[in-house]
Amino acid sequence: MWTFLGIATFTYVYKKCDDLLSVSYANKEVLGAFLVFFSLGLILSYRYRYGQGKGKKQPSNMGFISQLISALPLASSFFSGPTDSNGTEQGKANQYKKRKVSFSESVQTENSPSNRITSQFDPEIIIVGSGVLGSAMAAVLARDGRNVTVIERDLKEPDRIVGELLQPGGYRALKALGLEGTVEGLDAHIVNGYVIHDMESKTEVEIPYPLDENSQVQCGTAFHHGRFIMGLRNAAMAEPNVRFIEGTVTHLLEEDGKVTGVQYKEKESAETKELYCPLTVVADGHFSKFRKSLVKNKVNVSSHFVGCIMKDSPQFKPNHAELVLANPSPVLIYQISSNETRVLVDIRGEMPRHLKNYMIEKIYPQLPEHIKEPFLLAVQTDRLRTMPASFLPPSPVNKPGVLLLGDAYNMRHPLTGGGMSVVLNDVRIWKSLLCNIPDLHDNQAVLKIPCINFGKLVFTISNWVDSV
């Protein structure tokens, strides 16, 4: 069609030019000059339109006439129409398609193991739970350059009757992690050892903590559990690449047998959201929701601790915890602040219906004289609280993409006071192991970690720390 229009236009112009040429010689000169300059303008316009830029596609010889005509001024006004409109819409669609493809390609590149680019809100590690282990691990891994997101059900200060006595092994681990500042300003109490009261023989045995290489006592420390947790959380929150979310994790997300992230319900908005990462650390504590889906071992509850706080109670020996060998179960006593002392009474079997009566009638008569009066006052005025004394041996977690740690993974009797020591040493171990893996998407590198027989290692360390 364009060729036909070009020929018709050329014939029309030729005839008109013939009429003009028949007028006079002068007119012939003027018209000749006009045609020369007009042709030159067409050529320059054509070269400008199709000759710009290196590597641009040149028009074919078959389309030369149509392209030459289209270069004429106002040609687009005569020959544009629905086709141009459709072409514009198609161009917009192609442009959007290109942007969409480019975005998809960038996402694919960022998510590839070798070229992953993380940001503050694109975590490498998600930690479920912000207790001792979760908070401490978030702080130290963030200092190693990891982007960490912590999801905690309730970020208010917790109120518990256990997790208050940090043994020397745990205190050393806390210092090694650079977190010793978390026990400062808590009105904490230094502990240098134990005094064992044998009520049957009416004797006392002192058991001091071991000495260090400088012949100084390796002390422990006791405090309000909630204050310590808030100190650890503040240390983690101070790191710029740690993000805290207040919400409840409902599911571990899996793909091809590997944990790839979590689904959680945000507390403030009640919205259900998903978050993905290469490594999820489950540290949701004693009553773990996800333990049974990751390990086969079950929790064994041997007894219950009943706790209360005595005010201004004297100590048999300064800075020493006390253990009373009562009948039928022991009583643990340790100072947690400048004027408060925790009492934990171990009760085996079925819990008595009237706890206050049990404490007054069964426990009070067996206590040392210096404790009796403050104990009786505490039982009568303070709220008695209970906590199961649980045992859970460690076992391997045979699922990639997830770690199960803390009380969710391994527990021993609270009488040992070794729970937090084990937790902090586990943080030390995993900090050391993970620092050798710069990219946690490198599954092969991560899978090499179990080659150290991790279950046996944790069991050995747990027993060693408890014995310190």
Placement of each model-derived feature along the sequence:
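C-terminal helical "tail/cap" subdomain of flavin- and related membrane-associated enzymes
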Residues: 3-4, 8, 15, 32-36, ...
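Juxtamembrane "helix-exit" motif on the non-cytosolic side of transmembrane helices
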Residues: 13-21
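Conserved N-terminal helical subregion
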Residues: 120-122, 172, 180-293, 299-305
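A short, basic/flexible loop-to-alpha-helix module at the beginning of a structural domain
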Residues: 52-54, 75-80, 94-123, 269, ...
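Conserved FAD-binding catalytic core of PHBH/FMO-like flavoproteins
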Residues: 267-274, 278-398
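Glycine-rich FAD pyrophosphate-binding loop
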Residues: 126-130, 140-162
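N-terminal Rossmann-fold NAD(P) dinucleotide-binding loop
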Residues: 134-135
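FAD/FMN-dependent oxidoreductases across multiple families
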Residues: 94-100, 107, 353-447
